[in-house]
Amino acid sequence: MKLLIALLALVTAAIAQNGFGQGGYGGQGGFGGFGGLGGQAGFGGQIGFNGQGGVGGQVGIGQGGVHPGQGGFAGQGSPNQYQPGYGNPVGSGHFHGGNPVESGHFHGNPHEYPEHHGEHHREHHEHHGHHEHHGHHRH
């Protein structure tokens, strides 16, 4: 068992080096939006834990890949977050297979994105429409 634990520790170190937060960490959405949460290359990234899918498989938390329009598979990452010193193959924009997986940088609640708030408020306003009050006419 000790050998396995040591192996896991080594793999984890490799992940931190190669994938952890390299393409993700705010990802495409900046705000941590729909690219940061699932991250772009994220925790298992491309290399490391399990090769292709890493720790969280293909989609991670679900935000990274489910909303491609929001920066899911765009593979841009946040250029400011890329640390070139590592020289890792999973950098900002270089995703060999594009697994949006990251577990570590969760920027707030995935349900608290401004894009969604507008829709909910609009629904509420539509229901409270015109209430006509008809007076009682006394003859």
Curated annotation (Swiss-Prot):
Biased composition annotated in UniProt, kind: Basic residues: 122-139
Keywords: Developmental protein, Secreted, Signal
Range of residues in the leader sequence: 1-16
UniProt biased composition (Gly residues): 60-75
Claim: tRNA-binding is one of the keywords in the record: no
Location of this chain's protein in the cell: Secreted
Record's GO cellular component terms: extracellular region
Chain intervals with Basic and acidic residues compositional bias: 109-121
Domain of life assignment: Eukaryota
Residue span of region Disordered: 60-139
Record keyword Signal present: yes
Function (record text): Likely to be involved in the establishment of the head.
Annotated protein name in UniProt: Protein spalt-accessory
Gene symbol of the encoding locus: sala
